[in-house]
């Protein structure tokens, strides 16, 4: 597996202390970790879990804006934007990094996302992806997909910045649809990675 020290994990937090207490220990130690907080400063017990940079926004400007701030602060070549209620399985970051290096034509990658009951999560609230079709035919191998959910996006920082990141006029919901369309149209395919 590849060394993950060239990956920044960007997390947007809004009243997410409980979720962060599960996520933070699952992130590989060599990854830079950035939490953009749209609420109040995180408590000491969260800060004791691992090293991370916290950026405290003076106001909640939404998910996309906070992601853009986190990616701008990232010092690594790759960023992995994840929701705070995520927990990484072993080698998730390394597998995504390895696949991204094997598929330089792709614009971004998304892992298989499981709910707490281990059923596969579905990207909600998108007119770009039919839920019934996805659940019946979702790929069991690395495949191109029409849209990614904002819950987990692995992308080169350079690509994200080149595209201007998330549209900050979209406060919450559908900012991932917009980014997906721009990535597909201007950079390259979106790739689903079911073994991560």
Where are these regions (language model features)?
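Short aromatic/hydrophobic "clamp" motif used to bind/position activated sugar donors
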Residues: 79
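Acidic/His-rich active-site region of diverse nucleotide-sugar glycosyltransferases
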Residues: 56, 68-69, 87-164, 169, ...
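Acidic donor-binding segment of Leloir-type glycosyltransferases
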Residues: 24-59
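Acidic metal-phosphate-binding loop of nucleotide-sugar-dependent transferases
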Residues: 40, 61, 85-87, 170
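Glycine-rich, basic loop-to-helix element that forms the pyrophosphate-binding segment
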Residues: 57-74
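Catalytic beta-strand/loop signature of glycosyltransferases that borders the donor
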Residues: 187-196
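Short, well-formed alpha-helical segments that are part of the catalytic scaffolds
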Residues: 11-29
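Cell-envelope/extracellular polymer assembly enzymes that use nucleotide-activated donors
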Residues: 6-8, 32, 178
